[in-house]
Swiss-Prot record:
HAMAP family: GlgB. It catalyses: Transfers a segment of a (1->4)-alpha-D-glucan chain to a primary hydroxy group in a similar glucan chain. Catalyzes the formation of the alpha-1,6-glucosidic linkages in glycogen by scission of a 1,4-alpha-linked oligosaccharide from growing alpha-1,4-glucan chains and the subsequent attachment of the oligosaccharide to the alpha-1,6 position. CDD domains: AmyAc_Glg_BE, E_set_GBE_prok_N. Pathway: Glycan biosynthesis; glycogen biosynthesis. This is 1,4-alpha-glucan branching enzyme GlgB. The gene is glgB. The keyword Cell division does not apply. The lineage of its organism: Bacteria, Pseudomonadati, Pseudomonadota, Gammaproteobacteria, Cellvibrionales. InterPro entries: A-amylase/branching_C, Branching_enzy, GlgB, GlgB_N, GlgB_N_E_set_prok, Glyco_hydro_13_cat_dom, Glyco_hydro_13_N, Glyco_hydro_b. One of its GO terms (molecular function) is hydrolase activity, hydrolyzing O-glycosyl compounds. Keywords: Carbohydrate metabolism, Glycogen biosynthesis, Glycogen metabolism, Glycosyltransferase, Transferase. GO terms for biological process: glycogen biosynthetic process. GO terms for cellular component: cytosol. Coiled coil: none annotated. It comes from Cellvibrio japonicus (strain Ueda107).
Length: 737
């Protein structure tokens, strides 16, 4: 126990160790050569052991060479003076704490720095793509001794200590060393093991405030509401998805079917008692269902660690850790691996736009605005109560860019859906005049965010061929999906929010009124090929009072289900990749609720079975018929037959591939149409390959069971035409027999 009177005679360095304010404890602790050696002593070993009753220096345990460590009077410093040649490079300290508990460990202050100069330089430049292998907590062997290297970035800290269940959460035991002006702090602690809990105790240089922070680069965390990071061993998981990864590296995604099932893992399905399913349980159940339904990919709402269930994962605190709600990091690897083995891709919802203000996480990490902007006009998103990243800071960009690569490389994720891109690109996003700061040119474009996104896409596509990066971007920002070398942002695809809103608004209208809003169906084709669009019926459309997909539809129950089947027929035949949120595929009545399972019991009822069967058949048809996907992002893959029949609320068009085509006719009224004529490009016999009004889907079964033969009657710029029967609120797909 330290004695204040004795402390008055100590050097400033020793006092700073006692007061836990020293920036480099290696200057004081560990092994040091004496400035004036003698015949019996040329070396000093000094350790600081708060609460120690006694301590000894283990020189050679096998030969029982143990020397006493003498307490510096009135302090918890212990010292040994002797000849350095007697000591091994790494000696052990054996001591008893105030509770008489015996402790033995190697001296952490006898190890050389571990972070290399090149590593620190690349990080300062914002270009260390494997920085997650250095920063954080990493088990490693140094000089043959097992331990854990801890490292973090906190340039405005006066002192940082590693605290955990291995040192009684006492910041005096393991203060870290700062590496010059890099802002990086590190300490190798021998004997600490995977599974141990830890945090960083940080003292701010300006204010002297001391606080605990979880590890920004932590790869595992305690189950909420606890917030400690968990030391995680290097994974020995044996991946079995080599065939999938090889295929992904060479696939032409722009000419391939892409049908995405959007899933929230915590509420897709739960156990009998309402508990979460594990990653491994979800892997099998979800893969079986997705294969049955015919989706090509699963997109999961953010799986990175987050403290609040209500945020759905969008307020991330552990960017490098799969949430512990469903299991361990290797359990999540199993989830990905199993889906890949079943031929299913995985897209991860990723949130680089903002982060929460939780005191244990990134917010004011070292007591200053480190990851965020100091000025709230740049650094705060008031709508969401979150903070905005400072993309102009190299180390912040590196944190995010390396994180994107981390998921693609370490977890074999097939793509990232980047959340809230519009909020990143616009300095005045959701702000009134005077609440934002213009860029250097006086505009509202966030030039630093733009550069960040271009760099994100360049490195993701450059290092992981075939990986997708998809933007949720809700404005008219130009060239979102155009290559970075022509000035675009470089995304693979962009959500088509305009088409989605127009379509849902149109479908929500009573059919008798639809004729007056026909342009909501046709306008989207004016810009359909200006970007690589994805058509999203996402989670955002079935929450907060917007109603479920089935409840958006007008009419009685029969008409609601018919409208929904028609809507999905439109989705699967319109140019662009597809995305459908869970529950919509079987017409769940209620809005999505993250705290419980989907209403799977509805599949006991025919109408819900019918919608599910229609979606399943549309998925499989979409994957089997090249004209429905091969030119999804090309204007020559779509041709209107008739977009002008607003009076009857009917549209018809042709989808084309390199070798065949499909006719699509959609009737948006409950009135059957007989002998409805459409022009066709090729004479011959046509047959119905899909009818959303089929009895198998719960419809009235009106359609064209017999083959249809063209007539030499010119119609709508085509020399041949067909007379077809259109079912009420129904969609037809026809092909040459």
């Amino acid at each position: 126990m330290s004695n204040p009177k004795q402390e008055q005679h100590l050097s400033q360095d020793l006092l700073r160790i006692i007061t836990a304010t020293h920036h480099d404890p290696f200057e004081v602790l560990g092994r040091h050569s004496l400035p004036v050696p003698t015949a019996t002593a040329d070396t000093l070993v000094r350790v600081y052991l708060p609460g120690a009753r006694s301590a000894e220096l283990v020189i050679n345990r096998q030969n029982r060479q143990i020397a006493p460590l003498n307490r510096l009077p009135g302090t918890d410093f212990f010292e040994w003076y002797g000849l350095g040649q007697q000591l091994p490079v790494h000696y052990q300290i054996e001591w008893y704490d105030r509770h008489n508990q015996h402790r033995v460990h190697y001296d952490p202050y006898a190890f050389a720095p571990q972070l290399g100069e090149l590593d620190m330089h690349l990080f300062a430049e914002g270009q260390h793509w494997n920085i997650y292998n250095l920063l954080g907590a990493h088990p490693r062997q140094v000089d043959g001794i097992n331990g854990v290297l801890f490292a973090t970035w906190a340039p405005n800290a006066e002192r940082i200590s590693v605290v955990g269940n291995f040192n009684d959460w006492d910041g005096r035991h393991h203060p870290m060393r700062v590496r010059g002006s890099s802002g990086l702090w590190e300490l190798f602690i021998p004997g600490v093991q995977p599974g141990d809990l830890y945090k960083f105790e940080i003292r701010n240089r300006q204010t002297g405030a001391v606080f605990l922070k979880s590890d920004p680069y932590g790869q595992s965390f305690e189950h909420r509401p606890s917030t400690s990071s968990i030391i995680t061993a290097d994974s020995a998981f044996a991946w079995q998805d080599a065939d999938w990864m090889e295929h992904r590296a060479h696939w032409d995604w722009q000419a391939s079917p892409l049908s995405i099932y959007e899933v929230h893992l915590g509420s897709w399905r739960r156990g009998w008692a309402g508990e979460f399913l594990s990653y491994r349980e979800l892997a099998h159940q979800l893969a079986d269902y997705v294969k049955y339904m015919g989706f090509t990919h699963v997109e999961i709402l953010p799986v990175s660690e987050h403290p609040l269930d209500d945020s759905w994962g969008y307020q991330t605190t552990g960017y490098y850790a799969p949430t512990s709600r469903f299991g361990s990091p290797d359990d999540f690897r199993y989830f990905v691996d199993h889906l890949h083995q079943q031929g299913i891709g995985i897209i991860l919802d990723w949130v680089p736009a903002h982060f929460p203000k939780d005191a244990h996480a990134l917010a004011r990490f070292d007591g200053s605005a480190l990851y965020e902007h100091e000025d709230p006009r740049l650094g705060e998103h008031r709508d969401w109560g979150t903070l905005i990243y400072n993309y102009g800071r190299s180390e912040v960009r590196n944190f995010l860019l390396a994180n994107a690569l981390f998921w693609l490389k370490e977890y074999h994720i097939d793509g990232l859906r980047v959340d809230a891109v519009a909020s990143m690109l616009h300095l005045d996003y959701s702000r009134q005049p005077g609440e934002w700061i213009p860029n250097i040119h006086g505009g509202n474009e966030n030039l630093e965010a733009m550069t960040f996104l271009q760099q994100l896409n360049a490195i993701c596509h450059g290092q992981h061929s075939g990986a997708l990066v998809i933007a949720e971007e809700s404005t008219a920002w130009p060239q979102v999906t155009r290559p970075t070398w022509v000035g675009g942002l470089g995304f693979s695809m962009k959500w088509n929010m305009g088409w989605m809103h127009d379509t849902l608004e149109y479908m929500s209208r009573e059919p008798v009124h639809r004729q007056y809003h026909h342009n909501q169906l046709t306008f989207g084709m004016m810009y359909a090929f200006t970007e690589n669009f994805q058509l999203p019926f996402s989670h955002d459309e079935v929450v907060h009072g917007k109603g479920s997909m089935i409840n958006k539809m007008p009419g009685d129950d029969w008409q609601k289900f018919a409208n929904l089947r028609l809507l999905y027929t439109y989705l699967y035949t319109y140019p662009g990749s597809k995305l459908l949120f869970m529950g919509g595929e079987f017409a769940q009545w209620s809005e999505w609720a993250h705290g419980r399972s989907l209403d799977w019991h509805l599949l006991d009822y025919g109408p819900h079975q019918g919608v599910q069967s229609a979606v399943k058949d549309l998925n499989h048809l979409y994957r089997q018929v090249p004209s429905l996907y091969q030119r999804n992002f090309r204007g020559d893959g779509f041709e209107w037959i008739d977009c002008h029949d607003s009076t009857q609320s009917i549209i018809s068009y042709i989808r084309s591939s390199d070798s065949e085509f499909t006719l699509v006719i959609l009737n948006f009224t409950p009135v059957p149409r007989y002998n409805y004529r459409i022009g066709v490009p090729v004479a011959g016999q046509y047959q119905e390959v899909f009818n959303s009004d089929s009895q198998f889907y719960g419809g009235s079964n009106l359609g064209n069971a017999n083959p249809l033969y063209t007539q030499p009657v010119p119609w709508m710029n085509h020399g041949q035409s067909l007379e077809v029967t259109l079912p009420p609120l129904g969609g037809l797909l026809l092909k040459l027999a």
